[in-house]
Amino acid sequence: MKKILFVAFAFAAIAVSAAVSEKVVLWRNGDNGIKSFRIPALCTAPNGDLVVACDARKNNAGDLNVFQPINITLRRSTDGGKTWTKPENSWTWTWNDKEKWSGSDPSFIVDEKAKKIFLFYNVWKWEDTKTWDNNVYRFYVQESSDNGKTWSKPRDISADISFPE
């Protein structure tokens, strides 16, 4: 009996490890003109879909304090990670001669009761490209009520989570 159980568990372990060992590349540095993808976050949506986000760093792997456009890019899987939607930005931050914004460091919270996914991240608005002194570091949230298919506009929550000045 012990041998039968051992063999059954061994086959189960092999089957599980084979199922999870398939490699899927979600982002590759250089894709779509993006030099670096960093800081992934993953969650399971209320319906069981997988949602993943990461930084799409246009020019290099540098952080928010490195002068460059950074967006949060998302993908979704409805089959346990075997296939994924095309990458799309949760929001495309403005980067032009008048305004320069970057978003970075995504994280998720899933509210099972409300059936919502919340996507949190940092945002940097560049006011002065030579020093850090005049630049503004903010915290934003977006939410999805349809398991990550669509997202609300970004909402600045900095005042809600910061100490009063």
Indicate residue ranges for each PLM-predicted region.
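Asp-box/BNR beta-propeller blade signature and adjacent active/binding-site loops
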Residues: 19-165
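Sec-dependent N-terminal signal peptides
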Residues: 4-14
